[in-house]
């Protein structure tokens, strides 16, 4: 931390400078400078490291767990929070020294985890935060989750929140089926017991952790600043990947979210993977129906419009050099697929 104890300081090691890569090209370019976090968006942290700290449901569990030990989570510095994350976060980043809060807990049956989550979220019980937290992998988002490993690989399993309908897991499954049919890359996914949606982790391959960064981290936008526009996201995709195929894939995701009414398209719901110094967009995730959004609008606007039109989608595409005819073709294709698979 800086002397004011309010802003983080970061410097790449000599060894990393010799053959590493920038973990966040816009905020932390690969050079020997001493970087000081400039924005207060992440409570004095850098966006890329704030990505590792749980938000939403995970933050809620951690705060309650710490409160049992007499610790006010809101008084902890970013470095102290990262120390609690330690090696248990998503992606390749790990933080030493580690601070352990409580003890590891075995993964219960999924039905039991769902019941425990309901009890904690509805504040009927305060005794199971540790079980839920230690099986969440410090994942973000508002809904309960757990990490699970089976013969097929490593999975992130979602549970219902107290306000979700009974068929919420099946709905997300259907949305992923539709997204794949729309030409969108999604992780391998499955529906467990016809109610728990599970997606294979894309931050692990052959047992190795991959570096993953959200668009929010890379652009310096927190969840409290819903100012991202798909225009920015498309240009970020072009800048990082230098690949028009990846840009068109991101365009497809924008079109799908608008047509399928997934308005929970905030900056942490888009990620990039860096492997051997080369960036690519991650498989799409958190694809489901969300008509409420943010005051009824998309969290990420399209050319400044939170309720985007077809013309806005085309403008966003042509702005990044996708031909207008190709934009129209993709929009019509996705609209027809969603009409067939999602509109009931």
Describe these PLM feature segments.
Residues 1-267, 271-344:
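Phosphate/dinucleotide-binding and metal-coordinating scaffold of catalytic cores
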């Amino acid at each position: 931390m800086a002397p004011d104890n309010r802003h983080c300081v970061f410097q790449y090691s000599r060894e990393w400078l010799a053959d590493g890569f920038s973990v966040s090209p816009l905020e932390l370019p690969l050079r020997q400078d001493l970087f000081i976090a400039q924005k207060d968006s992440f409570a004095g942290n850098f966006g890329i490291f704030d990505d590792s700290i749980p938000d939403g449901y995970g933050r809620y569990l951690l705060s309650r767990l710490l409160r049992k030990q007499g610790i006010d989570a809101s008084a902890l510095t970013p470095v102290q929070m990262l120390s609690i994350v330690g090696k248990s976060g998503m992606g390749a980043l790990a933080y030493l020294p580690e601070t352990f809060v409580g003890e590891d807990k075995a993964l219960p049956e999924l039905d039991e985890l769902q019941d425990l989550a309901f009890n904690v979220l509805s504040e009927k019980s305060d005794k199971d935060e540790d079980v839920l937290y230690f099986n969440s992998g410090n994942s973000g988002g508002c809904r309960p989750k757990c990490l699970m490993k089976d013969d097929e690989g490593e999975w992130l399993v979602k549970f219902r929140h107290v306000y979700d309908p009974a068929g919420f897991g099946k709905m997300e499954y259907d949305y992923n089926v539709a997204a794949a049919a729309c030409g969108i890359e999604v992780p391998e996914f499955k529906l467990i017991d016809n109610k728990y949606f599970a997606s294979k982790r894309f931050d692990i391959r052959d047992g190795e952790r991959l570096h993953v960064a959200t668009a929010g981290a890379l652009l310096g936008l927190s969840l409290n600043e819903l100012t991202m526009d798909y225009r920015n996201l498309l240009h970020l995709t072009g800048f990082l990947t230098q690949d028009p195929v990846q840009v068109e894939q991101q365009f497809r995701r924008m079109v799908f979210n608008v047509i399928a009414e997934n308005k929970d398209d905030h900056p942490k719901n888009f990620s990039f993977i860096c492997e051997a110094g080369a960036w690519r967009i991650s498989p799409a995730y958190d694809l489901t129906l969300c008509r409420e959004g943010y005051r009824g609008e998309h969290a990420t606007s399209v050319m400044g419009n939170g309720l985007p039109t077809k013309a806005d989608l085309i403008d966003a595409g042509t702005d990044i050099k996708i031909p207008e005819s190709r934009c129209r073709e993709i929009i019509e294709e996705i609209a027809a697929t969603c009409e067939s698979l999602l509109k009931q």
